Amino acid sequence: MMDWTDRHCRYFHRLLSARALLYSEMVTADAVIHGDRERLLAFNPHEHPVALQLGGSNPARLAEAAAIGADWGYDEINLNVGCPSDRVQEGRFGACLMAEPELVAECVAAMRARVPSHIPVTVKNRIGIDAQDSEADLNRFVETVAGTGCRIFIVHARKAWLQGLSPRENREVPPLDYGRVCRLKAAHPELTIVINGGITSLDEAEAHLQHVDGVALGRAAYQTPWLLAEVDRRLFGTAGAAPSRRAALEALLPYAERHIAAGGRLNNIVRHILGLYHGQPRARAFRRHLSEHAPRDGAGIDVLQEALALVEGHGAPALAAAE
């Protein structure tokens, strides 16, 4: 998700789940080719498995960007054919490409040819756009792209209106149609179909997994990140208890110290953890303290320690930033 799932967000989420596949923000192919790759593509090895999501519509440039992403160590290369924003449409990528399945297939084929065979090239799409939203349209899109060898589709269970709705409205106004995604899977058992859109709990995720192969969580994972702490046990069958919220913060401290020592700002990290105590007593005090103090010049990990003391009680001992 653009402006959300940067490297700091992903590192934090990995502290909560060892197994969930994490996605980068969408990066345009041209930015990958011509931009600051260290800033755009670098990530901590602890983030694995991590996917690079690309935006674009030029097969040759997408292929080059995909090859670069593979060289940087990403575990999956994903093509975004689901974002409906005006800015994205002006660049001729995102959801508007669902009107051109043959072009998407050409892009995916070019990417596949430049990426090692063990790295999946996947597509994220909607169930339709504008008036092109029948099940036949969705099946044609998926079948056309699958003909290139693409085997994984992450399907947002809403259509997108390319005109008249903001990106936020496109996440809320078009009705969810989970049944259509389930029927897509039933029609194509050979494909891996991952459902996305409006899923806010692991109970819902478990219900969907009776019909599809995977579940993609977006805003729920960001706004209430603690739900990721139960993902390994409930969805992957991993033994052992989830880490505590305190333990997650303790594990984040050395990372934050290194980032600050390298010239970074504490708020680059803290803005992603504001929802950690969502629904817990004194969560508001936790968020308020971080929001007020982390953006300040010179803010250090003491801000995190103070916020923890507020949320867990004033008698909570300060954390030590130990490796």
Where do the PLM segments sit?
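Alpha/beta catalytic cores of nucleotide-metabolism and tRNA/nucleoside-modifying enzymes
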Residues: 2-3, 8, 106-109, 114-116, ...
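Non-cysteine beta-strand/loop elements that form the S-adenosyl-L-methionine
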Residues: 24, 75-85, 147-160, 217-220
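Glycine-rich, positively charged N-terminal anion/phosphate-binding segment
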Residues: 1-75
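Glycine-rich, aromatic-flanked loop segments that form ligand/cofactor-binding clefts
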Residues: 19-35, 77, 81, 95-106, ...
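A cross-domain feature marking catalytic cores of carbohydrate-active enzymes
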Residues: 26, 54-56, 81, 123-127, ...
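Glycine- and other small-residue-rich loops at beta-strand/loop junctions that grip anionic moieties
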Residues: 2, 54, 96, 100, ...
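Conserved radical SAM core fold
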Residues: 28-33, 56-59, 82-97, 159-164
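Glycine-rich tight-turn/loop motif centered on a GG-T
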Residues: 86-104, 135-136, 164-177, 238-239
